[in-house]
């Protein structure tokens, strides 16, 4: 049954890709890459949401070679566009006159030091680049070169995991989360946002690596928490319950985590569990208001 759905979704996706409003952009980028004798792909969230039939305006292009050189020529061919180059990271972004932004990066492999989530990068293959992605559903790519235009490259079964509504990492989850602990928050955010389940091994790896969230800046943590806060009702309650169950909340907002009186002496059946009561208040409020600061106050 899931396989049938996956097959239907795959052919529907290809049809949608050919009809997408960004088709001319993709064709243009593919032609530039062909002229430079480089392979290029649209990757990540755009591909995921194309399959899920969800809107996504984030266009990320991976070039096996220099992403900057393709971006520069793309800018030259589009009048009134602006080009931003980040040479240190080998990335570039072109903002078109209609405000569509396309980001370019050269395919790369990454390695990490234990005390930092900032990777050491070196040029790599498409597979290297897909291996460094956080989850299989974000590791898919669609080729833009003319001879393979529209071909899906899915080495880790991202389409299948979408069909099974499952969040799983493309490599050992313990390594994935130890290398970049922010991915643990992203994992919960995607699970809540998409209504997916987290793979058991992936879930266990979050618990085992929860303490590693301490090496992530508070600013980056707040960005992810605020994205979870944008959910509503039971989804929002589920998000914070998952943060608590994985012990991430214990390291991020220990005061909130300590509100859970489950199993604490003197609280059995005598008092309302303040933590889960607070989650219910938060969920109810989120159905009435999108004000993120009002939600935090709850």
Predicted feature locations:
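Extreme N-terminal basic, low-complexity initiation segments
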Residues: 2-6
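Catalytic cores of the polymerase beta-like nucleotidyltransferase superfamily
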Residues: 8-298
